[in-house]
């Protein structure tokens, strides 16, 4: 077993690239480290970063093809070696690089015989092809083939829902994921209570961006997700008439009361003292100070009433609900 030595900072949190290579036009690899981290931090960051790398980074794909030469999705065209389905699959694999917003409509227009590759796609200036040699189709006879394309920038997956044969237009399954794979591993070092961790992150991309660019993009997206939590005060949102309204769930204290009353007679509640509920000492003392001595006293208070009590928190309401659920 070969052990690799990596120099890491022992005081200031730092990251560095320890390996970077280009295996092909459509396969880049990078390995990065972040250290020093306290125990548990490496796993937290590694899981979040891997998910952000695979799901939060945008990519550009061909999402639709249209041609008068294409009669049906799975048919064969005279003068073309590949079936329509094979051509659509080849278009699906074309790797594009762009920062575009919205959609663009490039096209292919070629006269046979000959090979059609990604080089034959006429693109707008804002879009680049990563590998011009990617195969699309083979024309075996002197025919003209023109295909209109639609490209979009998005994230995740976009699965075609239906085929529109009437206008000879066909949706293409798109995978807007420039990061093909991402792994993380953790190395611990130090003695006793002084143990620290090094986080290793491995990234493979399709060539539309480098692993270093992917790491930066994923980090920025994670930061943007957490920015709202940095505001000290909770914001009030006002919905327009045409926006969807969502009812936020509240702790079902009232529902628990209704359920309990259905199971038992309310008269019995006044004979069940909170001493019998096996409450944590702090919750028990808070209730006693507020003159809540029986289960009936407790259930006659709303969730809001309980939270207003001194030293009584929302977590205590949750705890009470759990205890009542078991009774």
UniProtKB/Swiss-Prot annotation:
<dbReference type="GO" id="GO:0046983">
    <property type="term" value="F:protein dimerization activity"/>
</dbReference>
<dbReference type="GO" id="GO:0009507">
    <property type="term" value="C:chloroplast"/>
</dbReference>
<dbReference type="InterPro" id="IPR011263">
    <property type="entry name" value="DNA-dir_RNA_pol_RpoA/D/Rpb3"/>
</dbReference>
<dbReference type="GO" id="GO:0003899">
    <property type="term" value="F:DNA-directed RNA polymerase activity"/>
</dbReference>
<dbReference type="Pfam" id="PF03118">
    <property type="entry name" value="RNA_pol_A_CTD"/>
</dbReference>
<comment type="similarity">
    <text>Belongs to the RNA polymerase alpha chain family.</text>
</comment>
<dbReference type="GO" id="GO:0006351">
    <property type="term" value="P:DNA-templated transcription"/>
</dbReference>
<comment type="function">
    <text>DNA-dependent RNA polymerase catalyzes the transcription of DNA into RNA using the four ribonucleoside triphosphates as substrates.</text>
</comment>
<dbReference type="InterPro" id="IPR011260">
    <property type="entry name" value="RNAP_asu_C"/>
</dbReference>
<dbReference type="InterPro" id="IPR011262">
    <property type="entry name" value="DNA-dir_RNA_pol_insert"/>
</dbReference>
<dbReference type="GO" id="GO:0000428">
    <property type="term" value="C:DNA-directed RNA polymerase complex"/>
</dbReference>
<keyword id="KW-0804">Transcription</keyword>
<keyword id="KW-0808">Transferase</keyword>
<keyword id="KW-0150">Chloroplast</keyword>
<protein>
    <recommendedName>
        <fullName>DNA-directed RNA polymerase subunit alpha</fullName>
        <ecNumber>2.7.7.6</ecNumber>
    </recommendedName>
</protein>
<keyword id="KW-0548">Nucleotidyltransferase</keyword>
<feature type="region of interest" description="Alpha N-terminal domain (alpha-NTD)">
    <location>
        <begin position="1"/>
        <end position="233"/>
    </location>
</feature>
<dbReference type="InterPro" id="IPR011773">
    <property type="entry name" value="DNA-dir_RpoA"/>
</dbReference>
<dbReference type="Pfam" id="PF01193">
    <property type="entry name" value="RNA_pol_L"/>
</dbReference>
<dbReference type="GO" id="GO:0005739">
    <property type="term" value="C:mitochondrion"/>
</dbReference>
<dbReference type="InterPro" id="IPR036643">
    <property type="entry name" value="RNApol_insert_sf"/>
</dbReference>
<keyword id="KW-0240">DNA-directed RNA polymerase</keyword>
<dbReference type="InterPro" id="IPR036603">
    <property type="entry name" value="RBP11-like"/>
</dbReference>
<dbReference type="Pfam" id="PF01000">
    <property type="entry name" value="RNA_pol_A_bac"/>
</dbReference>
<dbReference type="GO" id="GO:0003677">
    <property type="term" value="F:DNA binding"/>
</dbReference>
<keyword id="KW-0934">Plastid</keyword>
<comment type="subunit">
    <text>The minimal PEP RNA polymerase found in etioplasts (PEP-B) is composed of four subunits: alpha, beta, beta', and beta''. Following differentiation into chloroplasts the PEP-A RNA polymerase in this organism has been shown to be composed of at least 13 subunits, including the PEP-B subunits. When a (nuclear-encoded) sigma factor is associated with the core the holoenzyme is formed, which can initiate transcription.</text>
</comment>
<feature type="region of interest" description="Alpha C-terminal domain (alpha-CTD)">
    <location>
        <begin position="264"/>
        <end position="327"/>
    </location>
</feature>
């Amino acid at each position: 077993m070969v052990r690799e030595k990596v120099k890491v900072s022992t005081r200031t949190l730092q990251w560095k690239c320890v390996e970077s290579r280009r295996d092909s036009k459509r396969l880049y690899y990078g390995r990065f480290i972040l250290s020093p981290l306290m125990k548990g931090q490496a796993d937290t960051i590694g899981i979040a970063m891997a998910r952000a790398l695979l799901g939060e980074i945008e990519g550009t794909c061909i999402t639709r093809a249209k041609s008068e030469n294409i009669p049906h999705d799975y048919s064969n065209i005279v003068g073309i070696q590949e079936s329509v389905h094979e051509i659509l699959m080849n278009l699906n694999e074309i790797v594009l690089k762009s920062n575009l917003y919205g959609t663009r409509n490039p096209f292919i227009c070629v006269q046979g015989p000959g090979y059609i590759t990604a080089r034959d796609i006429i693109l707008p200036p804002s879009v680049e092809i990563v590998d011009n040699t990617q195969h699309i189709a083979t024309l075996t006879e002197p025919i003209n083939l023109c295909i209109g394309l639609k490209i979009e920038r998005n994230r995740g997956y976009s699965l075609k829902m239906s085929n529109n044969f009437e206008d000879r237009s066909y949706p293409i399954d798109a995978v807007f994921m420039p990061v093909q794979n991402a792994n993380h591993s953790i190395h611990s070092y130090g003695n006793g209570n002084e143990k620290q961790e090094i986080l290793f992150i491995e990234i493979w991309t399709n060539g539309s961006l480098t692993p270093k660019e992917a790491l930066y993009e994923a980090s920025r997206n994670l930061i943007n997700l957490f920015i709202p939590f940095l505001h000290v005060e909770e914001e009030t949102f006002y919905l327009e008439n045409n926006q969807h309204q969502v009812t936020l769930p509240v702790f079902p204290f009232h529902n628990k009361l209704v359920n309990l009353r259905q199971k038992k007679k309310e008269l019995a509640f006044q004979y069940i003292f909170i001493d019998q509920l096996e409450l944590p000492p702090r919750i028990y003392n808070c209730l006693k100070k507020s003159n809540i001595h029986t289960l009936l006293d407790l259930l006659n208070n709303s969730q809001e009433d309980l939270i207003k009590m001194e030293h009584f928190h929302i977590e205590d309401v949750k705890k009470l609900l759990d205890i009542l659920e078991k009774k």
